[in-house]
Amino acid sequence: MSHLTVSKILEDPFSALSLSEMLKILAALGWSTNYLAMAHRTHADRLPAIAVLPLCCDIAWEFTYAWIYPQASGHWQGVVRVWFFLHTAVLAATLRYAPNDWAGTPLGKSRARLVLLYVAVIGAFAAGQLCLALEMGGALGFHWGGALCQFLSSSGAVGQLLTRGHTRGASLVIWGARAISTAGGFVKLCIRFQHQVDGAPWLDSPMCWFYIGIVLSLDASYPVLYQLTRRHEEASGRGNSGKVKNR
C-alpha cells in the first residue's frame, strides 16, 4: 500500500489513501507549475523571481535526493529528478538577470561574482543536506531538508515583496501554485501518517507542526502583501510595467 498507482486510485477513488495519492499528483504538478512560472516571470520582468537562499537550497535538496539518496525520496523519487531539471532552468534565468537585482552592490558589478556566489551557496546547502541525511537517516533527512526548502521559499517570497517595494519578479500564479502544493502536501502527509504508510515519519514532532503553521501563515500573508504593494505602485504611478534593462 506504500506505492499506490493511478489504477489503484481508479479502483477505490474515495479511500483516504487514494486521496493522498491524488494530492501527491496535485503537489507534483503544482510545484512544477511554480518553477515554470518563476522562469517565465524572471524572463518577462528581467528580474529574478526567487531569492538566492530558497533557490540554492531547493537545488541542493533535489540533487541530494535525486542522485545521492534516491531511495530516501520514496514515492517522490522520479518527481524530485524532474524538479531538479526544472530548477536548473530557473537558475539559468536567474543568473542571466541577477545583475539587475544586485545593482548598486559590489557583487552586482560582476556576473562572474554572482555565479560564484550561487555555486558557493548551492555547495553549502548540499553539504548541509548530506550532513542532515547522515545525522538523521535518509527518510527524516528528506523530509526535514524539504521543510527547510519550503520555509525558505515562502519566507523568501514575502521578503522580496517587503524589500523590493514593487511586484516585478513577483506573481500570484507563482504564489498560488506554491500555496496549493504546500497545503495539499501537508494533508497528504497527515493521511499517510494516520494510516502508517511511508512518506510521513515525522508528524509526531512538535517542531514539525510549528513548521507547518509558519509556512501556511507566510503563504496566507503573501497575497495580502502583494495587493498592498500593487496599490502602492499604482499610487506612485509605477505599475508593474516598468521593467529594468538587462545588463
Swiss-Prot record:
GO terms for biological process: terpenoid biosynthetic process. Its main location: membrane. PANTHER family: PTHR42038, TERPENE CYCLASE AUSL. GO terms for cellular component: membrane. In A.calidoustus, the austinoid gene cluster lies on a contiguous DNA region, while clusters from E.nidulans and P.brasilianum are split in their respective genomes. Genetic rearrangements provoked variability among the clusters and E.nidulans produces the least number of austionoid derivatives with the end products austinol and dehydroaustinol, while P.brasilianum can produce until acetoxydehydroaustin, and A.calidoustus produces the highest number of identified derivatives. Pathway: Secondary metabolite biosynthesis; terpenoid biosynthesis. It comes from the Eukaryota. This is Terpene cyclase ausL. Belongs to the paxB family. GO terms for molecular function: lyase activity. The chain crosses the membrane at residues 49-69, 75-95, 114-134, 138-158, 171-191, 206-226. Keywords: Lyase, Membrane, Transmembrane, Transmembrane helix. Its EC number is 4.2.3.-. The gene is ausL. It is a multi-pass membrane protein. Terpene cyclase; part of the gene cluster that mediates the biosynthesis of calidodehydroaustin, a fungal meroterpenoid. The first step of the pathway is the synthesis of 3,5-dimethylorsellinic acid by the polyketide synthase ausA. 3,5-dimethylorsellinic acid is then prenylated by the polyprenyl transferase ausN. Further epoxidation by the FAD-dependent monooxygenase ausM and cyclization by the probable terpene cyclase ausL lead to the formation of protoaustinoid A.
